[in-house]
């Protein structure tokens, strides 16, 4: 079993075995949550703030709530992270597709929320592509809709999309305008 496969299995076991500690962000308050989860109180607060302040982030969250994609949000230290933000496909099981979004912790709330929006846009791209059911189909989809964002290595390829970049910029603009009020 490859290192990635062992990691994915362990992560899936952790995600399935600990649903009671996962928090579902539901900006509408209508009980449709469960698709955005985190055990990080700061990320939970920032997600709540972002969905109250940014129409763009709110729309991304609503789209995910209406999808079969479940997103786990994690923060990681900048000195151990290969990128500021990244999304990893974990598994498709039980009618859901599970992804993990890892975010570097920033001091700026606005920057953190904008990065979260960028990565959640990627989760929406997966929600919009029902054929994405594993890492290989995810790579195929990103080769189709996006572009390579860095030089690939033997164990890692990174992609981005114009839509995700635009979502992050738009959310940052909305947050900055809200601060001016």
Enumerate the predicted regions with their spans.
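Boundary at the C-terminal end of the N-terminal hydrophobic targeting segment
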Residues: 22-24
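Acidic/histidine-rich, surface-exposed loop or edge segments in extracytoplasmic proteins
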Residues: 30-44, 95-104, 143-152
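Bacterial N-terminal signal peptides
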Residues: 8-19
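Short pre-active-site segment immediately N-terminal to the catalytic Zn-binding motif
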Residues: 100-116
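Catalytic Zn2+-binding segment of zinc metalloproteases
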Residues: 120-136
């Amino acid at each position: 079993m490859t290192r990635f496969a062992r990691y994915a299995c362990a992560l899936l076991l952790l995600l399935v075995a600990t649903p009671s500690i996962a928090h579902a962000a539901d900006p509408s308050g209508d009980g449709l949550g469960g698709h955005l989860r985190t055990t990080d109180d700061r990320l939970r607060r920032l997600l709540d703030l972002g969905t109250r302040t940014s129409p763009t982030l709110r729309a991304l969250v609503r789209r995910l709530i209406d999808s079969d994609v479940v997103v786990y949000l994690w923060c990681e230290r900048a000195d151990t992270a290969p990128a500021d933000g990244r999304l990893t496909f974990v598994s498709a099981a039980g009618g859901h597709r599970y992804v993990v979004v890892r975010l570097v912790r920033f001091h700026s709330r606005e920057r953190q929320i904008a990065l979260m929006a960028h990565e959640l846009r990627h989760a929406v791209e997966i929600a919009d592509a029902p054929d994405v059911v594993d890492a290989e189909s995810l790579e195929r989809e990103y080769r189709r809709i996006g572009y390579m964002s860095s030089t690939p290595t033997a164990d890692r390829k990174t992609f981005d999309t114009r839509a995700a970049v635009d979502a992050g910029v738009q959310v940052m603009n909305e947050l900055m305008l809200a601060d001016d009020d």
